[in-house]
Amino acid sequence: MSFTLHSVFFTLKVSIFLGSLVGLCLGLEFMGLPNQWARYLRWDASTRSDLSFQFKTNVSTGLLLYLDDGGVCDFLCLSLVDGRVQLRFSMDCAETTVLSNKQVNDSSWHFLMVSRDRVRTGLVIDGEGQSGELRPQRPYMDVVSDLFLGGVPADIRPSALTLDGVQSMPGFKGLMLDLKYGNSEPRLLGSQSVQLEAEGPCGERPCENGGICFLLDGHPTCDCSTTGYGGTLCSEDVSQGPGLSHLMMSEQAREENVATFRGSEYLCYDLSQNPIQSSSDEITLSFKTWQRNGLILHTGKSADYVNLALKDGAVSLVINLGSGAFEAIVEPVNGKFNDNAWHDVKVTRNLRQVTISVDGILTTTGYTQEDYTMLGSDDFFYVGGSPSTADLPGSPVSNNFMGCLKEVVYKNNDIRLELSRLARIGDTKMKIYGEVVFKCENVATLDPINFETPEAYISLPKWNTKRMGSISFDFRTTEPNGLILFTHGKPQERKDVRSQKNTKVDFFAVELLDGNLYLLLDMGSGTIKVKATQKKANDGEWYHVDIQRDGRSGTISVNSRRTPFTASGESEILDLEGDMYLGGLPENRAGLILPTELWTAMLNYGYVGCIRDLFIDGRSKNIRQLAEMQNAAGVKSSCSRMSAKQCDSYPCKNNAVCKDGWNRFICDCTGTGYWGRTCEREASILSYDGSMYMKVIMPMVMHTEAEDVSFRFMSQRAYGLLVATTSRDSADTLRLELDGGRVKLMVNLDCIRINCNSSKGPETLYAGQKLNDNEWHTVRVVRRGKSLKLTVDDDVAEGTMVGDHTRLEFHNIETGIMTEKRYISVVPSSFIGHLQSLMFNGLLYIDLCKNGDIDYCELKARFGLRNIIADPVTFKTKSSYLTLATLQAYTSMHLFFQFKTTSADGFILFNSGDGNDFIAVELVKGYIHYVFDLGNGPNVIKGNSDRPLNDNQWHNVVITRDSSNTHSLKVDTKVVTQVINGAKNLDLKGDLYMAGLAQGMYSNLPKLVASRDGFQGCLASVDLNGRLPDLINDALHRSGQIERGCEGPSTTCQEDSCANQGVCMQQWEGFTCDCSMTSYSGNQCNDPGATYIFGKSGGLILYTWPANDRPSTRSDRLAVGFSTTVKDGILVRIDSAPGLGDFLQLHIEQGKIGVVFNIGTVDISIKEERTPVNDGKYHVVRFTRNGGNATLQVDNWPVNEHYPTGNTDNERLQMVKQKIPFKYNRPVEEWLQEKGRQLTIFNTQAQIAIGGKDKGRLFQGQLSGLYYDGLKVLNMAAENNPNIKINGSVRLVGEVPSVSGTTQTTSMPPEMSTTVMETTTTMATTTTRKNRSTASIQPTSDDLVSSAECSSDDEDFVECEPSTDKSLSTSIFEGGYKAHAPKWESKDFRPNKVSETSRTTTTSLSPELIRFTASSSSGMVPKLPAGKMNNRDLKPQPDIVLLPLPTAYELDSTKLKSPLITSPMFRNVPTANPTEPGIRRVPGASEVIRESSSTTGMVVGIVAAAALCILILLYAMYKYRNRDEGSYQVDETRNYISNSAQSNGTLMKEKQASSKSGHKKQKNKDKEYYV
């Protein structure tokens, strides 16, 4: 049949319960009298419900039914108008009317049903339906009144009735019966002028043998499907033969004709040889399933077809005879049909009349469209599924059936097709696709899966769809946003080179955004975005989604609501490649091309909720099994909604906002300064001084149409760049900056290079006021296409962008300074202040950068809430000053600067102008004065500080003037405000003078200006109305002594001279700070040490000692700063040469820091057990070892100590020797001595490995300022030391700290800072780092470290080879002899008192020598002894500290020389005494032992050295007693390593001659010792 297909669909839902009351049910007879009525219990018609009854009448007007909300807005009224039924209803004061097509005043019985479905209300008369739909604000009807039939009581006051005049409407005249609410009968509350009527259409029980009577076209009809009889009245026996055996055989045959379908199988019967052409048909079958949706049976094509399916657990029938589709849905009263029980279906058609019944009880009857009565099909009969179910005409579902089908039979007047039996016996016309099993087996349920976190997802196989395809699934969630499905094709270059997005891909996606479901599709010619829901779908209920596509066109259905779509362009092919992602995207998206239109992907919104019944092209996907196979994190195989609200337990910390999600709470940490699931982790802070920035470089060019940006900031400046996206190829930017104390948002989308409307300039929004108050402020930006929203604290600004272009391109996210300046005309001012919690589209970039989670971060800013002193300049005298360009402050002004001084008075700033206009800022008697004249005479505002400000501390000054002429002066935290009337503009001209004036200008100053001299002190962070001048380079004129930096007047060790537990060492002309064990660097140990960030993929920094320069040590010192969040990883490991097995390892285990080392036999472990260190905060760990003794300390926490059990080595040796036979004494003694060596000496160190990658225990985070026995390996790595190799994810932060010293305060290299020597002979030393001086920095060799010295203990009688670099190993001898030091042991040391001036000690030649040395340098007593640190909480340590010292020596064949080492107090590194575990001691000097060339030589050396030791001691004592004969003066220039003249060995070598010759002239001088 070829007729025009009319898209006429209507749904008939009728449920008839048959029992004893059906035929006997009493009706109501209405006489049409005034004030007649029948009152029933209230019908709940608020959302979804049905009401039905039967009636007959012969009148054309009358009120049938009425209900309302008590006189407000809502009502529903059924009445007769001109013989037709009129439905009139209102919701939320929106009203509509529906009128039936059929005349009903014909004295025949008619069936009427009113169906409510939220905003839609339907009217069905005898199977023909119409509906009306409203668009109210709320999607439900308020029902307050009872239900009235036939009329409304007159005693109800009119104001309580919503519909005016309803009481005056004529009453109904006729019969009504079988009133039902759904399938239940309501209770009659009362009536008036109404009679009971026993007559009914089925009152005479016409059906026999248990047949069911129902109305059809107003006449009683019998349903005989459950009786075994046929005929009009179920009176004809239709059994096929007599006898019980036939019935048993028939039952057996029925049981055998069963088949199991699992979603991919189906049966196909070919009708091409015997086409169907019938006017009446019957289909019978039984099914059993857990599945909610699936095709059961289909035949026909185009406009002639029959489709039977399960749809959301109900049975759906769609029939089209050529003039339009008839659709019927049969639902059970309770539950669904997918309950895994058998259900029987019978469909009968006679001409246009169609009846479908399920289980013989639930019956639906209706009519097809117009007058077509013939069904024709020459196609196929599909059972259980089809090759492409979504493409079948009229198919309401897209997937195949899963479950069991039994006895599928089709018959008409001509043929009977037992389809199940034909498939089982293998009929030639029946094709079986897939593995169909002809018995009923259990089919695994498609269990739902629950995505518990936004990061959870699973991968699905490639979707092989080209021209057509279908996807269906159910989802359930309460969260408004989430990416549900995404897949894309192969990248292709766009032909238009001007396009901003130069690669394109076909893609398909489904996302939930703001509660609405969207389909996104691109088939090569542009993206379409289809909104598939009219109301929000995140209400926690299940929603069924069915997507069907044929070429460019298709439909997406959500709960039967269909939305058509058509793709752009001409292509009908969707070319996809790779996996399809369900629930979200993988963390590593390097291979993905994410379309800008897919906002959930750009914003990192993963789906949190449940998914079930996923079918792709009609075939089921067992997503639970896929999740288990992929071990998908955060995916569970169940779906239940928690009843309790998750936020009721207040899980969010630090004042974070809690939101209820899907079975979870969501903590919004914005504005708290914390992050984490419960906002429990403190976010990292970056400090900016105007020259610093953080730049995140995207791994690829980014294109977005939606952004979420949030952060906190704190600043005292009114101007400065906060955050900006920048592009290398366009002017595109999303920029946030401080502008006059407000936050300014500017979004500029460049239209130059792409085909879009010309840009109308950047969109700009402002929010906030006076934000430069040095308090934390929270900024949020939300952009969705053209919509912009800026929130600063509680101030909200919103805007809409003009034009059609919404795509933002960027390569970088920049903070502090904008480095990408090619496409901007005005560069924003640099930022001075602090940033925290920068989150851009779900990524917390500051913490990601700090922890090494991203490898594309350029970091020049400093971590931590630091006191920011930007670009300080020192004005050394009161006559010093400089001039800058005129201050531009005509209408408003924001000035900021910092100062530090000891002078009570002085000019800070002055600028004159036209007429009397001027501005001056000065210090008067220690207080700030702000003096100005705008033309109305001079005014002065005085700061109200609590005390004078000339206290040599930094102070902050903010001066503002707004458009209302309100002036404010803020000094530190004290504010003074004054409103000035009159002139508002400040018209300045001439130069701006800083820190003073030219000498002749002081006599011509305006009134109220008190200063007559310049400012002496330091100025920093100068901000002149948004301009950050460089006071030195931008100066137009300079006069006097002006220097960059601010050293201050202190030249002696003060309590705060050295920061971060650095050790202050008093020098001749100042002091130096030993920063070696602090992880910091700089003159005062307040600059970060060389810092590397190790990424999550692991990295390794490997230092290898040269083969001939490998040290062996008795004691070691190790310090490093770190921050990390990993629970397990190796920070540093030092290994001996292959085969020896000695090692030392610093690691984190279960979040706690520990050290394990082995120096001979067993592993020795020491651990900080109290507190985990993987909290993301910065920690400094210090480790010391002396033999088997060790200490470990984190920050200022208590020290952890380890001492070996037992007595000293010698005591143990003597005990053992008493029990050994005499002849075995010698070999046993040699063996025990060798074991003793192994227990105390770290032999032949070969390499230092940093990062743990070589051992498989990766460290992730940052490491800073690593120090080990004189080596700063990270500094060496930053300087590209040839002995260091770097591989993996390792990134240097910023630059290697450059250090410049001054004559006042210098800083020695940390590894050399403890090598100030006091000896009885003059010895040369070597340095292993760059010397810091004011003039220049001279590089030296890094090769000679601790390996350059030879140790001096009982194990040192092995051969020591001199360094091969003669220029760096030089000895100087005076008096014509070589000095030798005796052997020493730890027992020789006592806690002797030494000079408070130098804090140095000597190795003990004798107690008298120590006392003499101490007393010889007691003349200089500063305010605080050198060696004092700013750390009062630590316990005092013993005074004697011997630190590692690289020294040079000479070796001859008979005499051993050893350096004598002095060191200042080092209180912050507690160490252990190797022989006295009961007393806390610090170790001796780092002892370095060369590798022995042979064991035999060592044994011989021990015997020889014992005698030699005695001779050396006697010789030293003799020389001491005769010191006057060989006296000399120790030249301080040789003893201070920090002196630039000795910063490398070559210079020292050149001085040898003068040193020797000068010795004779000094022979008769008094003894002098400089320390």
Curated annotation (Swiss-Prot):
It comes from the Eukaryota. One of its GO terms (biological process) is postsynaptic density assembly. Its main location: membrane. Brain and arteries (at protein level). The keyword Cytoplasm does not apply. Belongs to the neurexin family. This is Neurexin-3.
